[in-house]
Swiss-Prot record:
Any one of the GO CC terms: endoplasmic reticulum
Protein name, UniProt field: Vesicle-associated protein 1-3
Organism: Arabidopsis thaliana
Keyword check for Lyase: no
Modified residues (N-acetylthreonine): T2
Spans traversing the lipid bilayer: 216-236
Amino acid sequence: MTTGDLVNIHPTELKFPFELKKQSSCSMQLTNKTTTQCVAFKVKTTNPRKYCVRPNTGVVLPGDSCNVTVTMQAQKEAPLDMQCKDKFLVQTVVVSDGTTSKEVLAEMFNKEAGRVIEDFKLRVVYIPANPPSPVPEGSEEGNSPMASLNDIASQSASLFDDVSRTFEETSEKSSEAWSMISKLTEEKTSATQQSQKLRLELEMLRKETSKKQSGGHSLLLMLLVGLLGCVIGYLLNRI
């Protein structure tokens, strides 16, 4: 806790859980230590484009507290060794009773004669978003190789399951392909047989038609021969 004559500020450092491409927030609390005076505050930072402070100005009533939320914008790169040089400055000054947050102006924090301004500097600290799990006190070094073997066995089992699943999926697809090929082969064989059957029926029909035509010519020839015989017989009788 940072303590002055007018306010207490907690915490003394702004700790942000750091994770790439994600926003992160933390808060600080300002408590008015006085019992009779209103205190105005203003929060500034060395990197205003990187942080958003809500509220960045305000008035704290006697004995009251105010929470300030600081949001760090999503970062594309991690700083070297997770060290941050950004800092925040909290300025406080006594204001008259009835002063509202909208009436807090930058000129109020100018250090003029007779005006007491308290400054508090807070540094920024990055902490891992997901800190490593602590090792139980009862664990021994001799157990670590066994744990590693268990991890390897678990990874191997998982890999085997993935390979088996992939093989089964491939086998199912192969079975479907062979079934489709077999079906197409049967359809092709059936179509060939139908074609041969139609060809035989057409050949038989052609032969029957040819026979009928031959029979018709023979009958006509016999009629002509008979008629010719009658004519010749008639002529012979006349002679």
